[in-house]
């Protein structure tokens, strides 16, 4: 059986953007650092890494749309943190952010990773931003690198 997969390596020529939702920045700043670390560790050239800042997670899909429409990026890593509160706001923001990112990804056919935390409390967010449960920004970047290489291997 022939196995087709993407490797975790960059040539240094790939242009990747990180879209970061600034809301809950104490968490999202750490996700960005994790994503940047993964990019550099796997051979990325920092000159080819861009950081796009948006106010909150709800704005990520529109920034993603504009970033991919520009043709400037080979892939995009989306990070943010939506923390449940006492109102239904969490449900609306989480659902629409997820759907929006998925729709834009399918429209453009470019690798996009989903590193948006959807958690019940700040403790869970901090754990997923590098304290106990790894750094989900790092994981999101490795996922997008792997998919970028998979697309190349598939001739896409």
Curated annotation (Swiss-Prot):
It is an enzyme of class 2 (transferase). Gene3D superfamilies: Lumazine/riboflavin synthase (3.40.50.960). InterPro entries: LS (IPR034964), LS/RS (IPR002180), LS/RS_sf (IPR036467). Keywords: Riboflavin biosynthesis, Transferase. GO terms for biological process: riboflavin biosynthetic process. One of its GO terms (cellular component) is cytosol. Its EC number is 2.5.1.78. Pfam families: DMRL_synthase (PF00885). 5-amino-6-(D-ribitylamino)uracil binds at residues 23, 57-59, 81-83, 114. Disulfide bonds: none annotated. One of its GO terms (molecular function) is 6,7-dimethyl-8-ribityllumazine synthase activity. It catalyses: (2S)-2-hydroxy-3-oxobutyl phosphate + 5-amino-6-(D-ribitylamino)uracil = 6,7-dimethyl-8-(1-D-ribityl)lumazine + phosphate + 2 H2O + H(+). Pathway: Cofactor biosynthesis; riboflavin biosynthesis; riboflavin from 2-hydroxy-3-oxobutyl phosphate and 5-amino-6-(D-ribitylamino)uracil: step 1/2. (2S)-2-hydroxy-3-oxobutyl phosphate binds at residues 86-87, 128. The active site is at 89 (proton donor). Transmembrane segments: none annotated. Catalyzes the formation of 6,7-dimethyl-8-ribityllumazine by condensation of 5-amino-6-(D-ribitylamino)uracil with 3,4-dihydroxy-2-butanone 4-phosphate. This is the penultimate step in the biosynthesis of riboflavin. Belongs to the DMRL synthase family. NCBIfam families: lumazine-synth (TIGR00114). This is 6,7-dimethyl-8-ribityllumazine synthase. The gene is ribH.
